[in-house]
Amino acid sequence: MSVTRRTFIASVPALAYVPRLIAQTGAAPFRSTGLSQLTLTVSDVGKSLDFYQGLFGMPVQARQGSTVLLRIGAGPKFLELRPAAAGERPSISALGFAVEKFDIDRAVKVLNDRGLMAAAAGAEKPAAMQYIVRTRKADLGGSADGTRELFVADPSGVLFQMHDVSYCGGSGAQGNTCRAVEASKRKGVMAVTDMSHFTINANDPKTVPFYQDLFGFQPQAYQAATPAWGVGAGVHFLMFTGNAGGSPANPGGGAAAARIGIDHACLGMNDFDPAKVTQLLVDYGLKKQEGQGRDPLVTFISLRMPNRGGAEGGTPELYFTDPDGLAIQLQDVKYCGGGGFLGDVCPPL
């Protein structure tokens, strides 16, 4: 097998992690079919629910107590609105991976074999390199005897859930029973049909190798020297800034200045037209701005130029912020983080 210059360069910062990778034989232990969910921790669930339903017309796919799960496209992918606890800052607080033939007991063994530890009894969520198995009962939308769920924190402390590809946040052994879907109370001014990607600011150089080890992620595109790590066989990806390892673009110099965690999430839509989408957002009440500030309820476009893998004249990347100032990017459903006007040109590397 030939090794491209890009593949070799991207592997250099991860060399300290290689002994563990060599110890693993065969394919990665988990096969993810793609991104499955994003969780927003919000100051007011009712306000955020009204905002997102008014914008996208998303039905309620499931409820987990006071947490609301909004269906993305045809489902079972979802956007979760979780109420912030007292003193908790609103954030994009978690992501999810759909995993083929998912089994919690096997997954826990895999994590234990890689040095992860169970979170302390009574913990609300795991710390970095920990996991937690939560049993969700009927009062939180699970089964009467409990729906078991697995949450993991990567080396930088970023939280993600792994679950079966059929998971919808409902009841049943796999959390895949969502029979009480509620139609949106508002029509929506546009529609999103799929997940796209997450951009994560990390502070531990083992972060990217951690995901490569578990899922076998490989670059599907580069923005300058920063890889878009493909998730599944489609166009979903993760991108890391800060000191994540696995990329010469992430030396760690800027990690301390930015907040560690998920910077923004991206959703895909059909027939993306940045000018039309911007106008719909403005008509919906958002303020168009030239800069990339994160005040609540603004929208802006950033042009990714050829030096960062974009098109001649720039690949338009559109962002908006919600009532809590959380940033969501909108792109065409074919967007892969690559070149072309739609960012959908990702030739094999």
Predicted regions and their residues:
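Vicinal oxygen chelate
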Residues: S2-V18, I22-A28, T33-D44, V68-R71, A84-A191, T199, ...
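Short beta-strand/turn micro-motifs at beta-sheet edges
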Residues: Q24-A28, R82-A85, S184-K187, A249-A255
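Core segments of cupin and vicinal oxygen chelate
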Residues: F30, T39-F78, F198-G246
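Sec-exported extracytoplasmic/periplasmic mature domains
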Residues: Q53, G57, E100, N112-L116, ...
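Short, charged/polar, Gly/Pro-enriched secondary-structure boundary elements
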Residues: G75-E80, R89, G157-F160, G169, ...
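Short, surface-exposed linear segments at secondary-structure transitions and domain or protein termini
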Residues: G87-S93, G172, S247-G252, G339-F341
